[in-house]
Amino acid sequence: MLSVELHAHSSLSYDGRDAVEKLLARAADAGLDALAVTDHDEIAASLRAVELAPEYGLLGIPGMEVTSAAGHVLALGVDEQIPDGLPFGTTLDRIHEQDGVVVVPHPFQESRSGVMANISRAELAQADAIEVYNSRLLTGRANRQARTFAREHGVPQTAGSDAHISEMVGRAVTLVETDERSVPSILGAIRDGRTHIEGRRTPWHISFRQAAGGAKRKFRERLASLLE
């Protein structure tokens, strides 16, 4: 059984704070086996984390959080950046073309780009897995909805800290039923549904601070682009 963090952001995300080195150090301190850095519409930091992970005694899983036209989609096991803004189904196809795994994070949280505001339940069931525990959700309702949906439709389940600062890495993890510490083995277990969920909610004041900081950074970046 391996303990895996499948949802974490570095400073390459507009709302992330820390370099991948800090995320890796925290993952090692938390006793994790593997970490996927999943920045918003960027893959460079994730690929860097894959290179550095062995220095921390970890396995790095390449990935990113893609902003599809419907909302957020985690692409795990991909080596090339998936374009943002594509339709939900096309985004899934692009991920699968790289033999990647599609995990839909916080699907019922509309305020945080959850896809269920824009797709059908049949479309959501096409995902390889659904994130049924996201530690940044302020209430448990959206997580419960995700878990109920996954159970009713037989979709594999994952958890993710959705960490935007290093201290929150490992807050919610996916326990994967495999003894082989490799990306293909972990992703294969997720596809097969050989997973268990462990998680604790991110303190609300940290979630609010992260959200506010991300909004300010995004505003500054947009303003800078307008002034160029």
Label every model-predicted segment:
Residues 1-6, 10-14, 18-20, 25, ...:
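Charged catalytic cores and adjacent phosphate/nucleic-acid-binding surfaces used
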Residues 57-58, 99-101:
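Loop/turn elements at helix/coil->beta-strand transitions in domains of secreted/extracellular proteins
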